[in-house]
């Protein structure tokens, strides 16, 4: 097997045993990118010169047996809405084309401390608004399992690059499913941590009460290793939680006998395709065979997740994106004749159609005549959804269901139909609204397109999710499939 498909754990072992140099790993990764990414189109920018320089510095430390850091010499790809100092960060938007940050995000500082190596920035839906990576201003990323299909979104580049063996891990952001849904479509492992588990400092905000950064990998243990590296309280983010337990790997191999798992009947209901239902039911039987107890439950407010999510997220986006005015930074219209024209033209020319749609929706929902009818009511629904989960978690350890209602759809199939596109978030948005952790792991395929199983946990109980996911992975995984892509 090529180095490009090795796990973080295996690469770390090879580096620690001096069987391979960090610079060899990085050069192998760039060779893979040159071979594969012209087709997949997962990267927006590469930082090759700095990456090789950093890897060669790590070679010297390796020779001196000074291999500090959990991710020493491990290559990484970062979603392009996460600030990277001195590396262009565009959010896949014309609005930020050419923007080079002068500071580092907290997650990047943490990863640098662990001696990971930045390979480049990954494609996404513009400002993380979309479910297919088709709203990117620069390019459309393809699904490595089927080049006629989307990779999902908004972290489509992050999932596609990992599946194609172009990086062992990537970071994405998840506002309503943007890590888990592309992980499902691309047959990889994607974790949306509990809200507050990972610092958002340096994440370009979409919806501040929903956004969360998380890792995407090809196996469960690698995912847990990366989350350990990026978790922790941060003085720069007032919403980051002071939770001490960031050990997700020590108990990961523990069995799940006696664990109580809830399967909501709504998660296998209307809108979920038959092939997804079949795969998830088979996955549930696998969990039972591993000793877990699985019962059917109800989360009655699930159907209100999408409408309440899109009102809340769009409202927050309309405020967060007000900073892009054509004056301080970002796209600046050359044709404007007045200050008012500058605002209007810079924003209308700099933002894509989906971003403008959500700004309009959010501004409408926050307007004085409609605030109570839409925004306030949506926040009440959010509370009801959280209460549903709280009630289930009084008796159960984990909630299980599909990650997405269908497998990946074809490129161009839904981009002009926003309501159909939004419906793909049916099973992921409630997790963000409730602030809970959720992980997607591969559980099947239909016509060559992967299907993801979603596991949802109690607040700050990512450890249990990793245990269940790890045990399930011993029975079903796509490890042998990646190299054949």
UniProtKB/Swiss-Prot annotation:
A Pfam family the protein falls into: Amidase
Reactions catalysed, as given in the entry: L-glutamyl-tRNA(Gln) + L-glutamine + ATP + H2O = L-glutaminyl-tRNA(Gln) + L-glutamate + ADP + phosphate + H(+)
Keywords assigned: ATP-binding, Ligase, Nucleotide-binding, Protein biosynthesis
Gene Ontology biological-process entries: translation
Residues annotated as the enzyme's active site: 79 (charge relay system), 154 (charge relay system), 178 (acyl-ester intermediate)
EC number of this enzyme: 6.3.5.7
InterPro entries, A to Z: Amidase, Amidase_CS, Amidase_dom, AS_sf, GatA
Domain of life assignment: Bacteria
Enzyme class: ligase
One Gene Ontology CC term in the entry: glutamyl-tRNA(Gln) amidotransferase complex
Family to which the UniProt record says this protein belongs: Belongs to the amidase family. GatA subfamily.
Record's subunit section: Heterotrimer of A, B and C subunits.
Its job: Allows the formation of correctly charged Gln-tRNA(Gln) through the transamidation of misacylated Glu-tRNA(Gln) in organisms which lack glutaminyl-tRNA synthetase. The reaction takes place in the presence of glutamine and ATP through an activated gamma-phospho-Glu-tRNA(Gln).
Listed name of the protein: Glutamyl-tRNA(Gln) amidotransferase subunit A
Gene name per UniProt: gatA
């Amino acid at each position: 097997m090529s180095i490009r498909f090795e796990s973080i754990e295996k690469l770390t072992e090879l580096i620690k045993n001096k069987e391979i140099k960090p610079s060899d790993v990085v050069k192998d990764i760039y060779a893979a990118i040159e071979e594969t990414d012209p087709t997949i189109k997962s990267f927006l920018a590469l930082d090759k010169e700095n990456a090789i320089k950093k890897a060669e510095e790590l070679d010297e430390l390796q020779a001196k047996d000074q291999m500090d850091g959990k991710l020493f010499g491990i290559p990484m790809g970062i979603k392009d809405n996460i600030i990277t100092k001195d590396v262009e960060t565009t959010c896949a938007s014309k609005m930020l084309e050419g923007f080079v940050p002068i500071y580092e995000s907290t997650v990047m500082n943490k990863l640098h401390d662990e001696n990971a190596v930045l390979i480049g920035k990954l494609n996404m839906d513009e400002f993380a608004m979309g479910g297919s990576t088709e709203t990117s201003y620069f390019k459309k990323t393809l699904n490595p399992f089927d080049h006629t299909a989307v990779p999902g979104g908004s972290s489509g580049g992050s999932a596609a690059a990992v599946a194609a063996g172009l990086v062992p891990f990537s970071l994405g952001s998840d506002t309503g499913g943007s890590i888990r849904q592309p992980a499902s479509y691309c047959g990889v492992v994607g974790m949306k941590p509990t809200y507050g588990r990972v610092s958002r400092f340096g994440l370009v905000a979409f919806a501040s009460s929903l956004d969360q950064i998380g890792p995407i990998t090809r196996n469960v243990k690698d995912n847990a290793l990366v989350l350990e590296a990026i978790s922790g309280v941060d003085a720069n983010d007032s919403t980051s939680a002071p939770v001490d337990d960031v050990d997700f790997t020590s108990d990961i191999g523990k069995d799940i006998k006696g664990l109580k798992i809830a399967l909501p009947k709504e998660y296998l209901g209307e809108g979920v395709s038959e092939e997804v239902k079949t795969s998830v039911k088979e996955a549930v039987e696998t969990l039972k065979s591993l000793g877990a107890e699985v019962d059917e439950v109800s989360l009655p407010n699930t159907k209100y997740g999408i409408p309440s999510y899109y009102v809340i997220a769009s409202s927050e986006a309309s405020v967060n994106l007000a900073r892009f005015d054509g004056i301080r930074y970002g796209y600046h219209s050359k044709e404007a004749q007045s200050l008012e024209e500058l605002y209007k033209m810079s924003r209308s020319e700099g933002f894509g159609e989906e971003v403008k749609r959500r700004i309009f929706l959010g501004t409408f929902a926050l307007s004085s005549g409609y605030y109570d009818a839409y925004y306030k009511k949506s926040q009440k629904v959010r509370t009801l959804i959280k209460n549903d989960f709280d009630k289930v978690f009084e008796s159960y350890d984990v909630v299980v269901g599909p990650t997405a209602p269908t497998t990946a759809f074809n490129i161009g199939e839904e981009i002009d139909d926003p309501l159909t596109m939004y419906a793909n978030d049916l099973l992921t948005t409630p997790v963000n609204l409730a602030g809970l952790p959720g992980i997607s792991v591969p559980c099947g395929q239909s016509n060559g397109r992967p299907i993801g199983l979603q596991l949802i946990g109690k607040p700050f109980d990512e450890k249990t999710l990793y245990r269940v996911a790890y045990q399930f992975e011993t029975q079903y995984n796509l490890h042998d499939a990646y190299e054949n892509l």
